């Protein structure tokens, strides 16, 4: 008799994706972030669902409803902080996952990579809209500043912004629609993630060497299921340390002040995970130029497969490319720091230099390094 997990139409899909899946025998902990992202997504959907039961998307009551969740709802405070800090963990895992893809050349799986870029953009949009919902000062002004950037689009800009706002400023209509989108998008993300996985399983996973691992596969279960469980435990440990000991560490104190359209905060800045892009936006004095640089700073990921010049897939055996990769990481950390600083000397200059270096590294230096390494190996 055939095993039910191999014959049942539904169980068969699960079996082929998580149990009998042939996996490379040498994938490191950098390959754990995919499953961690899945856990983050499920966690965010569950905590978000319980928050939505008590939240009201009206400008007069939104701030109070969040306070009510934290003070009056049973364990509301832990649900709220797990959701807020869960977003931070989500982005840490996302950036690690993308970094792994860049380092080991996983972007050569074109469909998987491009769907991943779409996923990144969707998660960023979801997080931005979620930040607006508590209706604190930073929520309101963040929404105003970021949506206002679209007015830089020639001819249709102003109409587009007013259409998104649902009026002539960020108001009740904006908050209501942002709540609606923030609720639906995670389910769309879940669907896209399944397509991401589908395309990955067409080719199989990459591995640190970047060489085909068809000759040496092991079953996903029990080897990588146990490895993923360890990763999940560490993720939950990190999240709960943050939630229980420093819940407001990554937040902005301004968001504990109710939104006031008549009072602009001295430093408007997004959550930490958007600061690198915000720094690139601010480094260009022209509004449209800044918006284009902001968009391109993320969309540049879609160009990465076209910029791959090396005959080797992974950076494992390419020291020159490795140096440039870590320079890129350092540059992104510098941009993150600059994005949180006021617009004054010397931060302006540092931000501009770091922004130029970001694009220079990806578009010029890394492809050049690939070519040089080919020459050195007489390929």
From Swiss-Prot:
Single biological process term from Gene Ontology: mitochondrial electron transport, ubiquinol to cytochrome c
Q: How is the cofactor bound?
A: Binds 2 heme b groups non-covalently.
Domain of life of the organism encoding this protein: Eukaryota
TM spans, by residue? Answer: 33-53, 77-98, 113-133, 178-198, 226-246, 288-308, 320-340, 347-367
Q: Give the binding site residues for a ubiquinone.
A: 201
- Which tissues does it occur in? Detected in heart (at protein level).
Localization (cell): Mitochondrion inner membrane
- Which InterPro entries does the record cross-reference, listed alphabetically? Cyt_b/b6_C, Cyt_b/b6_C_sf, Cyt_b/b6_N, Cytb/b6-like_sf, Cytochrome_b, Cytochrome_b_C_euk/bac, Cytochrome_b_N_euk/bac, Di-haem_cyt_TM
| Cofactor dependence | heme b
How is the protein disposed in the membrane? Multi-pass membrane protein
What Gene Ontology cellular component terms go with this record? membrane; mitochondrial inner membrane; mitochondrial membrane; respiratory chain complex III
| Binding, heme b b566 | 97, 196
Q: Which GO terms describe its molecular function?
A: heme binding; metal ion binding; ubiquinol-cytochrome-c reductase activity; ubiquinone binding
**Sequence positions that bind heme b b562:** 83, 182
The record describes the protein's role as: Component of the ubiquinol-cytochrome c reductase complex (complex III or cytochrome b-c1 complex) that is part of the mitochondrial respiratory chain. The b-c1 complex mediates electron transfer from ubiquinol to cytochrome c. Contributes to the generation of a proton gradient across the mitochondrial membrane that is then used for ATP synthesis.
**How the protein assembles, per its UniProt entry?**
The cytochrome bc1 complex contains 11 subunits: 3 respiratory subunits (MT-CYB, CYC1 and UQCRFS1), 2 core proteins (UQCRC1 and UQCRC2) and 6 low-molecular weight proteins (UQCRH/QCR6, UQCRB/QCR7, UQCRQ/QCR8, UQCR10/QCR9, UQCR11/QCR10 and a cleavage product of UQCRFS1). This cytochrome bc1 complex then forms a dimer.
Q: What else is known?
A: Heme 1 (or BL or b562) is low-potential and absorbs at about 562 nm, and heme 2 (or BH or b566) is high-potential and absorbs at about 566 nm.
Member of which family? Belongs to the cytochrome b family.
The name on file for this protein is Cytochrome b
Q: What is the lineage of its organism?
A: Eukaryota, Metazoa, Chordata, Craniata, Vertebrata
């Amino acid at each position: 008799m055939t095993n039910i997990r191999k014959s049942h139409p539904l169980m068969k899909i699960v079996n082929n994706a998580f149990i009998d899946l042939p996996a490379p025998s040498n994938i490191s902990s950098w390959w754990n972030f995919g499953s961690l992202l899945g856990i983050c997504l499920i966690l965010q959907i569950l905590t978000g669902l319980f928050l939505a039961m008590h939240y009201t998307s009206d400008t007069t009551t939104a701030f109070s409803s969040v306070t009510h969740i934290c003070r009056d709802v049973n364990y509301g405070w832990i649900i709220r902080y797990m959701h807020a800090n869960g977003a931070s963990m989500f982005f840490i895992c996302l950036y690690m996952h993308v970094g792994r893809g860049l380092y080991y050349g996983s972007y050569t799986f074109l469909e998987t990579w491009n769907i991943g870029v779409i996923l990144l953009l969707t998660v960023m949009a979801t997080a931005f809209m979620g930040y607006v919902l508590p209706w604190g000062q930073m929520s309101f002004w963040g929404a105003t500043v970021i949506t206002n950037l679209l007015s830089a689009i020639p001819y249709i800009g102003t109409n587009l912004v007013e259409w998104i706002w649902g009026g002539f400023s960020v108001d009740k209509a904006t908050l209501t629609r942002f709540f609606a989108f923030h609720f639906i998008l995670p389910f769309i993300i879940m669907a896209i993630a399944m397509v991401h996985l589908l395309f990955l399983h067409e080719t199989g996973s990459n591995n640190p060497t970047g060489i085909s691992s068809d000759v040496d596969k092991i079953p996903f279960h029990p080897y990588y299921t146990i490895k993923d469980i360890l990763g999940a435990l560490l993720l939950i440990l990190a999240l709960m340390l943050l939630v229980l000991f420093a819940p407001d560490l990554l937040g902005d104190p301004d968001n504990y002040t109710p939104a006031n359209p008549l009072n602009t905060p001295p430093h408007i800045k997004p959550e930490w995970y958007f600061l690198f892009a915000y720094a690139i936006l601010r480094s260009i004095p022209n509004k449209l130029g800044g918006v284009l640089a902001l968009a391109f700073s993320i969309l540049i990921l879609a160009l990465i497969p076209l910029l791959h010049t090396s005959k080797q897939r992974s950076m494992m055996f390419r020291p020159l490319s490795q140096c440039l990769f870590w320079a890129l990481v350092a540059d992104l950390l510098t941009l993150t720091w600059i994005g949180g600083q006021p617009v004054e000397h010397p931060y302006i200059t540092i931000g501009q230099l770091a922004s130029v270096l970001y694009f220079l590294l990806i578009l010029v230096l890394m492809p050049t390094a690939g070519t040089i390494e080919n020459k050195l190996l007489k390929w």
